[in-house]
Amino acid sequence: MPQKFEQMQSAEQKHDEDETIAQAGTQIDDTVDALDAVLDDIESVLESNAEEYVGSFVQKGGE
């Protein structure tokens, strides 16, 4: 009898672990999508006017 309880408990723990892993996977996918969006924005700015963008970070004559 105690063995059955341990097996049931183990199955429940595995199910909980599977749910946690699935949730973590979803969060990772969301984070990757957000990062991709930021990188796409940066790429579009650089494609449209890279010289002006880079020039805004360059110091001029002792500034």
From Swiss-Prot:
**Pfam families xrefs:** Pup
Q: Name one GO biological process term.
A: protein pupylation
Per UniProt, location of the Isoglutamyl lysine isopeptide (Glu-Lys) (interchain with K-? in acceptor proteins) cross-link in this chain: 63
- Pathway info: Protein degradation; proteasomal Pup-dependent pathway
Tagged with keyword Nucleotidyltransferase? no
What residue intervals traverse the membrane? Answer: none
Listed under subunit, the entry gives: Strongly interacts with the proteasome-associated ATPase ARC through a hydrophobic interface; the interacting region of Pup lies in its C-terminal half. There is one Pup binding site per ARC hexamer ring.
Q: What does this protein do?
A: Protein modifier that is covalently attached to lysine residues of substrate proteins, thereby targeting them for proteasomal degradation. The tagging system is termed pupylation.
Q: This chain belongs to which protein, by name?
A: Prokaryotic ubiquitin-like protein Pup
Please report the organism this UniProt entry assigns to the protein: Bifidobacterium adolescentis (strain ATCC 15703 / DSM 20083 / NCTC 11814 / E194a)
